[in-house]
């Protein structure tokens, strides 16, 4: 009798589950893919690094293939022509939505931030605010002094504490990029030396770390609904995390109202709130703050570390970049943002780093608002659509010797059109220009001010960390020697 009581409900569940899932995809001509297991689908196959696994699947099943994560259909695109088909015209409109995951419900204000909101009037308003009020060319130029100050602090620290010594770059680059964004948003420094308020800074760091650890689609309940019954602990955790971050951001807003801090994104948005409270509510401002401080930091720091790693592996490239800067800028002053236009080889180095080592190897997922076709296959409404940018950036059909670091390939202006570091279509990252400016200026300054060499002549480990963001598994260590320009800078 006990056996029947256990087996019968399980059998009924399996039958109901199979019926419910098959009814969602019945009659569709889905892209090919591996044979799924009952209930879990292909979850048992998904092992990091996922972008490399997906490239192997693409080699076997084609440039577009399908998987099943529990009850959710997943489609992965791995070719440039299919990406262009997906994100142009009406298809781009259909694919503007994001799939829903549990963390975003509680941390991203119930899917209302610019990164999570559904396509519609609310999202268009957020996009308008970003384009015109936060990340316009004039606004970014207005924050150039912040970028230059943070870079100068980094250069000074390297010169005084690490001249002729081994330095681990990742923590310093992370401090640089986090401080740049947080100062733009709030006017405060939370990382490195001379922080605004140590207690407040430590709380912010902990919240950011906890959100990053729980972000993405990491909870099985996102794919197997029955597990939500047993997953209340996780849901309570991310709910509490969202409430803690909201309280932190609200305190920053309230303090800014009282103190009237000038030339920050928050102060500018609060000034607009006075005339248009509907379009600049506290929730909208907090959502924009959250998006900037979470999404605007990782990419730049990761890209800078990969760029330096590639330069150490290719000293002839580093030498050529240094010669370009010395010729165009000299050693009497630091490279400045307006100089970047006259440093094409530096630009090519950054483009090649974006290509070979994208910080986000899989683009942020999309979800169609209605059924559509891609590559002749049916993509049902609600499917999780992923683009394997890493695989496309190494596609031998697009690139000569794709595994090699060769900045010269971007001397052909058409090459940059094949990059997709910041997404595609309507949901291209609104902070792309800011990220590029920061990486170019910081990398140019590091090349101009120091001679770099490997530690004891050892080869640079280029192994990837198996996470959603493609960091280096082994943090980059190098020896830096200050050049004469640093004497002038510190005088």
Curated annotation (Swiss-Prot):
Task: Provide the transmembrane region boundaries.
Answer: 283-303
Question: Which is one Pfam family of this protein?
Answer: p450
Q: Does the keyword Oxidoreductase apply?
A: yes
GO cellular component terms, A-Z:
membrane
Pathway listed for it? Secondary metabolite biosynthesis
- Superkingdom is Eukaryota
Which keywords does the record carry? Heme, Iron, Membrane, Metal-binding, Monooxygenase, Oxidoreductase, Plant defense, Transmembrane, Transmembrane helix
Q: Which cofactor does it need?
A: heme
EC number(s) on record?
Answer: 1.14.-.-
Q: What molecular function terms (GO) are annotated for this protein?
A: heme binding; iron ion binding; monooxygenase activity; oxidoreductase activity, acting on paired donors, with incorporation or reduction of molecular oxygen
**PANTHER family the record matches:** CYTOCHROME P450 82C3-RELATED, CYTOCHROME P450, FAMILY 81, SUBFAMILY D, POLYPEPTIDE 5
Q: Which family does the UniProt entry place this protein in?
A: Belongs to the cytochrome P450 family.
Record's protein name: Cytochrome P450 81F2
Q: Which organism's genome codes for this protein? A: Arabidopsis thaliana
Gene behind this chain? CYP81F2
